[in-house]
């Protein structure tokens, strides 16, 4: 399945820094320090992306991560205030389970998953992070779970049924 490219210039994107980490490369003369940043961007209206950036200074790492996140935007199908169905996303040793929730529930999610869900524009959702809690892997596992979501119309078309038969 080929993802259609989303133009970030057309969207009013907000960004949120999920994690900043100091990383070191050991060389002959000692350690070379750099900073690694993970950023999530979204328009709170069904578009979200995550990016990773590394640089000698924190602001540069964040800027690079934002640019990377804008290159990896995905569209999330939202039904009312929640998602259409359950999904499980896997990335590395992290697994994230996302479930639709009734209106008024709110975003029940941990730090990294919460950032992705809120910037995607999902108002009501239940999530569970399983396995590794490494923020980078959790963010990517959440994005993988959101990529699996299909609109009810798409499911009906794929099964060769009417929308009423699917929703009942």
UniProtKB/Swiss-Prot annotation:
Subunit structure of this chain's protein: Part of the 30S ribosomal subunit. Contacts proteins S4 and S8.
GO MF entries: rRNA binding; structural constituent of ribosome
Origin superkingdom: Bacteria
Function: With S4 and S12 plays an important role in translational accuracy. Located at the back of the 30S subunit body where it stabilizes the conformation of the head with respect to the body.
Family: Belongs to the universal ribosomal protein uS5 family.
Organism from which the protein derives: Caldicellulosiruptor saccharolyticus (strain ATCC 43494 / DSM 8903 / Tp8T 6331)
Gene3D superfamilies referenced in this protein's UniProt entry, alphabetically: 3.30.160.20, 3.30.230.10
One of the GO biological process terms: translation
NCBIfam families noted in UniProt: rpsE_bact
Residue stretches making up the S5 DRBM domain: 13-76
InterPro entries xrefs: Ribosomal_Su5_D2-typ_SF (IPR020568), Ribosomal_uS5 (IPR000851), Ribosomal_uS5_bac-type (IPR005712), Ribosomal_uS5_C (IPR005324), Ribosomal_uS5_N (IPR013810), Ribosomal_uS5_N_CS (IPR018192), Ribsml_uS5_D2-typ_fold_subgr (IPR014721)
Name this protein carries in UniProt: Small ribosomal subunit protein uS5
Disulfide bonds: none
GO terms for cellular component: small ribosomal subunit
Keywords carried by this UniProt record: Ribonucleoprotein, Ribosomal protein, RNA-binding, rRNA-binding
Gene responsible for this protein: rpsE
Swiss-Prot/TrEMBL domain comment: The N-terminal domain interacts with the head of the 30S subunit; the C-terminal domain interacts with the body and contacts protein S4. The interaction surface between S4 and S5 is involved in control of translational fidelity.
């Amino acid at each position: 399945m080929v993802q259609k490219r989303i133009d970030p210039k057309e969207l009013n994107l907000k960004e949120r820094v999920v994690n900043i980490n100091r990383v070191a490369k050991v060389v002959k003369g000692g350690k070379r320090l750099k900073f690694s940043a993970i950023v999530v961007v979204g328009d709170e209206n069904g578009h979200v992306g995550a990016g990773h950036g590394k640089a000698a200074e924190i602001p540069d790492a964040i800027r690079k991560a934002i640019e990377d996140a804008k290159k990896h935007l995905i569209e999330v199908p939202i039904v009312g205030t929640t998602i259409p169905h359950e999904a499980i996303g896997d990335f590395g040793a992290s697994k994230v389970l996302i479930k639709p929730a009734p209106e008024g529930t709110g975003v029940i999610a941990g730090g990294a998953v919460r950032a992705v869900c809120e910037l995607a524009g999902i108002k009501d959702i239940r999530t569970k992070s399983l396995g590794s809690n490494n923020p980078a892997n959790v963010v990517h596992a959440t994005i993988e779970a959101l990529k699996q979501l299909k609109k009810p119309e798409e499911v009906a078309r794929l099964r060769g049924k009417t929308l009423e038969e699917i929703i009942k």
